[in-house]
């Protein structure tokens, strides 16, 4: 009856243990999103604990919520009360959703490929030779790196939101500004 709560707890405990005990698995699991799953599970457990949502009774629906492929690696972290009902409700194909989804995906690709990926080599070089940089170069590094981070994560999020939107699923925006 409460299997999803136990599953979420196990995911959160495994993620926390791996984070604290750094193992060889770090090279495999964390890049595959274990930290994301840990936060997702903690979010779910918190909502259930504070009774902001009821515990999901169907463990298959819960696993679909936890493993929803559009937010698999990059988020956004969704509240169970927002995403679970959408995943349970069959949705017909709607052309306008597909177009809107493709626009989000295109925007995400622009952010990721044309902004983040172009800035990244520059900031990498600067960070590897930080002691040899002039004041202007340090200032440029401080200005460019947040732009790179924003474009990278925001781009991935836009791609995930767009892909989900094409299926009629509305994910929460991570970056409103």
Task: For each feature predicted by the language model, list its residue ranges.
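Membrane-embedded transmembrane alpha-helical bundles that form the catalytic cores
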Residues: 1-177
